[in-house]
Regions:
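Subunit-assembly interface segments of extracellular/virion macromolecular structures
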Residues: 1-344
């Protein structure tokens, strides 16, 4: 969740049951957030123990094929209708509150009608429900800003979202193709094994530099010289090569750096933030820019100079629809001083 927090402290193996505030101690966001996480974990565990790892209320999320006109002696599946109601996955409640929701019109993602026209549903296919939490800030929901505080935002929100997904047979493994018709085939485990690549670990180290001053002295070459708490966030977009630790990034003649630049088509794509990715602003249409120039971006002004965007910074451009549909992200360099990025 890309919110401005000090740190996440909830740890399920510790089995804490509540948080106890003490007199004379400063309240911090990490304590409040952990208290909510403890109660949420207990509630979902309770629901999973009673219901099981999955279960529906009535015909909730029942899948009904929508077939088209006969073609070659068969009626191809054009779309899928998703039943109304509540469904539980590992204790997480997801709700479809609308009638006649289809695979192509579900609220939180999925293929569009054009996608299904270009690539029709082939039978057999695996249809499954994916459920996760989606973080929202005032940028996605302006109601989260408090008018009494001059429009400042306070807490962010998290909501449960869902998506009915299709896995066509041509994407199944050999074992899945062989055993899919067997009763009790472990589809859940098969799907979870596909996400193994997303559960990697990151090893980081701190470069103290050559500065030999006292604990209160700050290296003049340090990029960050503040004293406030920092929660670093790193996101890997594409796996690949990284600049070797032996290379000098500031030396254009460094052989390791030169080799890396020569092969950067295979380089990893990632981003990092000292503020847990919470430095964000709305991007809006530039009315006063040349319509023929598609490289000019207009964004709302940052909340302050420290947490704003500086010339030379890389900016990620995305929107909520892309996030939910897991589409690609776009990056551009903030070249404000050269007129390529303007503030509204």
């Amino acid at each position: 969740m890309k919110s401005d927090n000090t740190r996440p402290t909830f740890n399920k193996p510790r089995r804490y049951t509540r948080l106890i505030f003490q007199q004379g101690r400063p309240p911090i966001d990490a304590d409040f957030n952990e208290a909510h996480e403890i109660q949420l974990q207990m509630l979902r565990s309770y629901a999973a123990d009673l219901i099981g790892d999955q279960g529906a209320v009535g015909g909730a999320f029942e899948i009904t094929p929508e077939r088209g006109a006969e073609e070659g002696g068969t009626h191809p599946v054009k779309d899928l209708t998703i039943g109304t109601g509540r469904y539980y996955v590992d204790g997480m409640q997801c709700e479809n509150g609308a009638d006649a929701v289809k695979l192509s019109t579900q609220p939180f993602g999925g293929p569009t009608a054009d996608d299904l026209l270009q690539k029709p549903i082939t039978v057999p296919a695996l249809v499954y429900l994916d459920v996760w939490e989606h973080h929202r800030t005032w940028i996605e929901d302006d109601v989260l800003r408090d008018p009494a505080l001059g429009g400042s935002d306070t807490g962010t929100r998290s909501r449960t979202v869902w998506e009915v997904r299709l896995l066509s047979k041509d994407k199944w493994t050999a074992d899945e193709k062989k055993n899919f018709a067997k009763k009790g085939f472990a589809w859940k485990e098969a799907l979870e094994s596909r996400d193994g690549a997303n559960h990697g670990k990151l090893r980081v180290r701190f470069n103290a530099g050559a500065h030999g001053g006292g604990d209160c002295d700050v290296d003049a070459d340090a990029r960050y010289r503040g004293v406030e708490n920092q929660l670093y966030r790193v996101e890997i977009h594409r796996a690949g090569m990284a600049l070797p630790s032996s290379a000098d990034p500031d030396d254009p003649k460094d052989p390791d750096k030169k080799k890396f630049l020569d092969e950067r088509a295979h380089a990893a794509t990632f981003k990092w933030s000292r503020e847990n990715g919470s430095v964000a602003a709305r991007w809006v249409k530039a009315r006063d820019c040349d319509p023929a120039d598609g490289t000019v971006l207009r964004i709302e002004g940052p909340r302050d100079e420290v947490h704003g965007f500086s010339a030379g910074d890389w900016i990620e451009i995305t929107e909520e629809v892309d996030d939910l549909r897991r589409h690609g992200w776009y990056f551009c360099a903030d070249q404000t001083r050269r007129g390529r990025c303007a503030y509204a």
